[in-house]
A protein has these predicted regions:
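N-terminal strand-loop element at the rim of the active site
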Residues: 1-7, 13-58, 221
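Short donor-sugar binding/catalytic loops of nucleotide-sugar-dependent glycosyltransferases
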Residues: 2-5, 187-191, 206, 221
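A short, histidine- and acid-enriched strand-loop-helix "catalytic/donor-clamping" loop
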Residues: 6, 57, 87-88, 100-116, ...
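Carbohydrate-associated surface elements
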Residues: 33, 137, 158
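Short His-centered aromatic/hydrophobic patch
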Residues: 81-87
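Acidic anion/phosphate-binding donor-loop and adjacent secondary structure
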Residues: 112-113, 143, 158-175
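Nucleotide-sugar donor-binding and catalytic loop/hinge architecture
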Residues: 167-183, 208-209
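Conserved donor-binding/catalytic core segment of Leloir-type glycosyltransferases
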Residues: 176-194, 200-203, 216
Length: 222
């Protein structure tokens, strides 16, 4: 569901994970088509199979293809899923002997207990051996909505190795921050659900302790 060149936090995380796993052997990726994905895929050492078309049909086609692929490849060492919906249509018998992992973050599992979506989430995760939460907050939420505590592990999202910053951007950053302290930056869409308003309230309170604090938010939105 989430993979570059589409822009987003989960996309970056899954792209980074796939590339990092190349250090341990060949990696096969099943992902949705996206504008520019053909060119992007050619630049990588990953074997990537893309799926286009209507979203609902794509979900079934991808699951059927993955089920067939697993059945015909007995040397699969592990499988990583980015979302519970990616697991939902997978045959549990096909993956029962394979170490399986699925990432969770609060938004996609936060459904009322006993609701239809909550039941779908729980049934999907029954097929998975390891549930990877991006924070202790998400782990706690997972337990509250009915996921088994013993399956959930917290691994904070990683990042790429630092790149060399071009002088042009270094000067731009210096102009923005000047002599401010502390310097804080976030990269996120400016959506209300991301609670930027609460961060701004915190910054306002911190300004009494750190009068030169500067907070920069980078992202599209309203």
């Amino acid at each position: 569901r989430s993979f570059p060149p589409e822009i987003g936090g989960m996309q970056n995380l899954m792209g980074g994970l796939a590339n990092a796993l190349l250090n341990h052997g060949p990696v096969k990726v099943f992902a949705d088509k996206f504008e520019g994905s053909d060119v992007y895929d050619q630049s990588l050492k990953l074997e990537i199979e893309r799926f286009g078309g209507i979203k609902l049909l794509r979900k079934y086609r991808k699951a059927n293809r993955l089920n067939d692929f697993i059945k015909s490849n007995q040397n699969i060492r592990s499988i990583f899923f980015d979302h519970w919906k990616s697991i939902e249509k997978i045959n549990d018998k096909v993956i029962e002997k394979i170490p399986t992992f699925c990432l969770i973050h609060s938004k996609e599992i936060n459904h009322p207990l006993g609701s239809s979506l909550n039941k779908r989430v729980i049934n999907s995760f029954k097929k998975i051996k390891f549930i990877i939460a991006n924070s202790n907050f998400t782990k706690k939420l997972g337990i509250e909505i009915g996921l088994p505590k013993e399956k959930i592990y917290v691994i904070h999202p990683g990042c790429e190795e630092p790149i060399e910053v071009e002088k042009e951007y270094e000067l731009k950053a210096e102009k923005i921050y000047q002599d401010s302290f502390p310097k804080i930056i976030t990269v996120a869409r400016l959506d209300r659900r991301k609670n930027h308003q609460n961060i701004l309230m915190c910054i306002r309170n911190l300004k009494e302790i750190f009068p030169k604090i500067k907070y920069v938010s980078v992202g599209d939105g309203e």
